[in-house]
Amino acid sequence: RKGIEIEILGIESKLNTELVTEKSKIKYKLKGTVDRIQSENGIIKIIDYKTGSFQPYKLSFKEYEELVSKKKKEAFQLLCYCLMYDKNNEKQISLNAGIISFKNMNLGLMSLKKSNSVSFTNDELSTFKETLDKIIEEIFDTNLSFSENESLK
């Protein structure tokens, strides 16, 4: 598009970060490979490519707790990438993220959206980390037993 300045910051960029849960101080690592990171008119965008068909509704949510659903796994993945990018960069930034599906190229970049907002600030990512911490805490809670979630089948 005319007037848009894009700078490629990374292709197949390996990201990782070490985090600690607030409650029990459990240390854990996140790592992943982002297909593309770019700056578009000064806005950082995390982009994941999918070879199959993909629908934009899978990237929309209102509360972070929704991301535990198998139907929102791509949104969860993108937020993990955003959190890792944020933790590896000292500047206070706002991130956008999305998916480009090769089978739905006509849709262009399908943006990750929380309550119709496509920007994820440091504060938003801190709130997502709290959700991630809860998951880690549950995994390590010896008082909880694991069972298959019927709703995820």
Residue ranges and their predicted role:
Residues 1-153:
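RecB-family 4Fe-4S metal-dependent nuclease core
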